[in-house]
Amino acid sequence: FCGLFSSILWIGLPIVFFRLIFLNIDSFNGWDYYQILFLVGSYTIVDGVMMGLLIRSMGILESDILSGNLDQILLRPFDTQLFYIFRSFNLVQFVNTFFGLAIIFISYGNLNVHLNSLKILFYILSLMCGCIIYYSIWFLITISSFWFPTKFSKVDVFLNYIGISKYPYNIFTGINRLITMLFVPNLLIANPAVLIFLGKDTLNLFFYQIVFTVFLIIISR
């Protein structure tokens, strides 16, 4: 029950935050309230799936790195990364995915968006890339324990870092946006999918997301 309550609180806070902002303005850098709500919902879908898979597994991986138990795992005849991805689930976190779906359906009902099968396909593919980016960032932060062991958990580092993913990427402008995309790639988790869905982007950011996804796959292997 406590986990479910914290999930509702975690999802509800940004919704309330944006609602308060839009009490005084009609749009924010070209985004209205329901468009941002759609972004929050889309990110929550990715977050629910990946947190359900990884919130325990990444902690176990970090512990195995620090204790030396990883050496024994590496000698086993299976893919080590897949082993850790599916090693332990958190079912409460998976519930967030359904909250995310509810949010996007509610927001979609208030959006003037023309849908077609190609747009839906690109949206789904982009969210899948977002899942890979989400995992890769968390994995790379976790394995940094090889070189930079700390007294605090790398899980906390990741959770503090990933929160910005639910915000529109174009709150940054000019050179700041370029720097942000290079050094804060978590903004690529949900933004490209939502921009495609809303018709705000001509697939440019989506193609950049694909390239960056391939790059992360290579370096995380």
Protein language model features and the residues they cover:
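Hydrophobic transmembrane alpha-helices and immediately adjacent juxtamembrane helices
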Residues: 1-221
